[in-house]
Amino acid sequence: MNTADDNAKQRLQELIGPDYTLQWIVGHGGMSTVWLADDNVNDREVAVKVLRPEFSDNTEFLSRFRNEARAAENIHSEHVVTTYDYREVADPAGHTFCFIVLEYIRGESLADMLEREGALPEELALDVMEQAAHGLSVIHRMGLVHRDIKPGNMLITANGILKITDFGIAKAAASVPLTRTGMVVGTAQYVSPEQAQGHQVTPASDVYSLGVVGYEMLSGRRPFTGDSSVSVAIAHINEAPPQMPTSVSAQARELIGIALRKDPARRFADGNELARAVSAVRLGNRPPQPHSPAVQATAVAPSPSASTAMLGQVARPTTSVPASPTVLPERQEKRGSGVGLGLLIAAVIAAVIGGIIWAGATGVFSGDSEETTTPETITQTVTPTETTTSEEPTLAPPPVQPTRQPVPTPDETPTRLPTTTQESPTRVSPTPEETDEPGEQTTPGGQPPLSTLPTSLGWQNNQGGTGNQGNPNTTGNPANPGTPGTTGGNGTGNAGGNSPDAADELLMSLDELMNVGGNQ
C-alpha cells in the first residue's frame, strides 16, 4: 500500500471511528467499497460497506444505501447476511459519510462458482435453490421483496451454507418505488416480466428470479440472452424459456417451469411455497402446484446434508489481495502448497533420471552413436489455483531392449489430484415436450404492446452488488460480495459483485427502447 493509499485509509478510519479497525479492501460495487475490518467492541471480523463519496450527495443513491441497511437490519436468518450497524457522519467538507457494518462471510459467490464450474449437479443445484428459498421466505414474511436475486448476491460459505445479500433495491411490497414512476431497477438477466414492465412487484417476482438462477445452475446457461439489457428484458416479457437439457430430471424441469411462468399469479407465491416445492422434488416427487395445501404450510429449514457439505467443497474462497502483502492471513500463504506441487517435482525428477538411464543404455554419452538424438521436451503448465489443470508430462523410462532409434513408450502417468472442477456437460438437444405454459401473446416483431413498456428502463447490471470479496472461506463477505459483498454481496469474501454482469446503470427512453426492439 503506497503513501497515498495509507493516507486515504487513515482519513477513512478517522471518519469511521474507534469501534471498527479497517484492514483492507475486499470488494467493490457500483456505488460502494467493502472493507474487511475488526469489530473492536464485539471482537469479530466484519464487512464495512462504505458509500462512495461521489454518491453521498446524490439523493437517489443515498436513499438506496439507507434502504439497504434498514431493509436488512431486522432480518434474522441463517440464509441472509446479517446487518450489524449503520451510521452517517458529516465529513470535514460537510458531506454525508455513510457506512453499513455487515456479517463477514468467508466463501464464494454463486456467480463465481458458476463461471468456473458451468452447470452444477442437480442435487447441488436443488440444495442451493432450497436454501435460497428459505432465505427469501424470511424476507417475504417481513413484508419485503428483494428485487435483485441473482448469483452475484448469493454467497456460499466453506460449509456449504448459502446466504442472500445486497438489499440495496429491496422494497416493502406496498411502498412506493425508490425511483421515479416508469423506471425499472434490477438486473436484466434475472428480472421478472412484471418488474421489467415497471409493474407492481410481489414475492412472486423474487420466485421468478430464483427460477432463472435455477435454470442457469441446471442448464449451464441463462434462459435469455441478448445484445442489450433491453432486449433481454423483452425476452423475459414475451418469450418462453428454451427447453432444459433432458439430463435434468422431469421433476426439476417442471419445478423451474412453474417458477418461470409469466403470470405471477400462476407461480409459487413466495419463498415459502418454493422451498416446499423444492423439498418435494429433492425427495423424487413432482413439485406441488402453487397455492395448494402442500406448499402453504410453513417450510422447515433443511438440515445440512451430504449435498450441502459437497457444495461447501465446490465453493472456493476467492480473496482480494491487499496491497501490502504483510497483512495477508497466514492461511492464504499456504494455498499454493500441497500434494500437487510435490507430485509435480517428483514427476520432473523421475523424467530426468529416466532420461539419464536411457541415455546411458543407448550410448548417447559414449560417443559411439552415429545419430544425433534430440531429447524430448517435457512441458508442464501450472496455474496456482486450487483447480490446477496441467498438461501431463510424458515420462520416458529406459526401454528394455534399446534400438538405434529408441522410441520411449510412457508406461506411467503421474496421478492427478482430485479437483472439484467438473466437466462441462455435453449439450444434448432436448426432444420436444409439452410445457405447462401456453404461448405468450406478442405483437409483430416479438415486441410487447406499447402499453406494457415502462417509460424508461434503468438496469443495475451489478451481478454482485457491492460484495465483500472475502478471504478463503468467503461466501465472500463476494462472498459478504456486497454485503459482493456483504449486502451486495458479502461475496467473494463480501464482494458480491465480481460477476459477469457487473456494471452499468442504463436509462433508456421509450424511443430508444423501440429502436432496439425493432432492430432485433
Swiss-Prot record:
Polar residues: bias regions? 416-429, 450-460
> In what residue span(s) does the Protein kinase domain sit?
20-281
Stretch list, region Disordered = 315-334, 366-504
Active site positions, chain numbering: 148 (proton acceptor)
Q: Which UniProt keyword terms apply here?
A: ATP-binding, Kinase, Nucleotide-binding, Serine/threonine-protein kinase, Transferase
Q: Which residue stretches does the UniProt record annotate as biased composition, category Pro residues?
A: 395-411
Biased composition of type Low complexity is found at 374-394, 440-449, 469-484
Compositional bias per record (Gly residues), positions renumbered to this chain: 485-496
Q: What is its EC number?
A: 2.7.11.1
**Has keyword Ligase?**
no
* Catalysed reactions listed for this entry: L-seryl-[protein] + ATP = O-phospho-L-seryl-[protein] + ADP + H(+); L-threonyl-[protein] + ATP = O-phospho-L-threonyl-[protein] + ADP + H(+)
InterPro entries named in the record: Kinase-like_dom_sf (IPR011009), Prot_kinase_dom (IPR000719), Protein_kinase_ATP_BS (IPR017441), Ser/Thr_kinase_AS (IPR008271)
Provide the binding site for ATP. Answer: 26-34, 49
CDD domains in the record: STKc_PknB_like
Q: Which GO terms describe its molecular function?
A: ATP binding; protein serine kinase activity; protein serine/threonine kinase activity
Query: What family does this chain come from, according to its entry?
Result: Belongs to the protein kinase superfamily. Ser/Thr protein kinase family.
Q: What is this protein called?
A: Serine/threonine-protein kinases drp72
Q: Which organism is it from?
A: Corynebacterium efficiens (strain DSM 44549 / YS-314 / AJ 12310 / JCM 11189 / NBRC 100395)
